[in-house]
Swiss-Prot record:
InterPro entries membership: Flu_matrix_M1, Flu_matrix_M1_C, Flu_matrix_M1_N, Flu_matrix_M1_N_sub1, Flu_matrix_M1_N_sub2, INFV_M1
Pfam family, one: Flu_M1
Subunit structure: Homodimer and homomultimer. Interacts with NEP. Binds ribonucleocapsid by both interacting with genomic RNA and NP protein. May interact with HA and NA. Cannot bind NP without genomic RNA.
Organism: Influenza A virus (strain A/Memphis/4/1980 H3N2)
Protein name in UniProt: Matrix protein 1
Length: 252
């Protein structure tokens, strides 16, 4: 796996699923391929994205700044600086300085990532802030190692939280989660279907599913009534894809 592929993988792991994630993935691919060289416009676009947490925006801004060639005097962005200040905690800053000194002696991506993984996400973000504000200088490879370690820490905590929700025995939470998944699957189907004539059927199925979820929420239904909703939708989607000549088996 190439270095940039690895960076893209880690960064996208902390972005919530949805149309915005697909957009960010495309931007990252363009940046890494050298197709997008307007850092100013890229940062302005990132700043105004909804849903993303300030820290995620800060990490993406850091990655864009590392990758896109820019004029020396280009102004640093406040939204990135604020996100990478370790919540203003002096302990984070102390640890960030110690980590920076270690990273300065490191030259490889994996070496930097190994060192960084033993620090908290707050200290890692502060260390990124030091580098972003030009208070410290490390090689691009080492900076990417720091980025990936930070994303791994964040993704770990997101995964723990997600696992707790999936494993919950509370029927109301499970019911709502199934309806949310069915609704987002329906949205994805509508987007994939596009405007072709054969898409009418898939669009109809997706639309009915969303109306059904709305009705279930409006009248309040038994928690078990949502079982299998998403799977039924995915089966419909796969049937539609086969007719279109697309073979994708990995949605479930």
């Amino acid at each position: 796996m190439s270095l940039l592929t690895e960076v893209e993988t880690y960064v996208l792991s902390i972005v919530p699923s949805g149309p915005l994630k697909a957009e960010i993935a495309q931007r990252l691919e363009d940046v890494f391929a050298g197709k997008n060289t307007d850092l100013e416009a890229l940062m302005e676009w990132l700043k105004t994205r909804p849903i993303l947490s300030p820290l995620t925006k800060g990490i993406l801004g850091f990655v864009f700044t590392l990758t896109v060639p820019s004029e020396r005097g280009l102004q640093r962005r406040r939204f990135v600086q604020n996100a990478l200040n370790g919540n203003g905690d002096p302990n984070n800053m102390d640890r960030a300085v110690k980590l920076y000194r270690k990273l300065k002696r490191e030259i490889t991506f994996h070496g930097a990532k190994e060192i960084a993984l033993s620090y908290s996400a707050g200290a890692l973000a502060s260390c990124m802030g030091l580098i972003y504000n030009r208070m410290g200088a490390v090689t691009t490879e080492v900076a990417f190692g720091l980025v990936c370690a930070t994303c791994e820490q964040i993704a770990d905590s997101q995964h723990r939280s997600h696992r707790q929700m999936v494993a919950t025995t509370n029927p109301l939470i499970r019911h709502e989660n199934r309806m949310v998944l069915a609704s987002t699957t329906a949205k994805a189907m509508e987007q994939m279907a596009g405007s072709s004539e054969q898409a009418a059927e898939a669009m109809e199925v997706a639309s009915q599913a969303r109306q059904m979820v709305q009705a279930m929420r409006a009248i309040g239904t038994h928690p078990s009534s949502s079982a299998g909703l998403k799977d039924d939708l995915l089966e419909n989607l796969q049937t539609y894809q086969k007719r279109m000549g697309v073979q994708m088996q990995r949605f479930k």
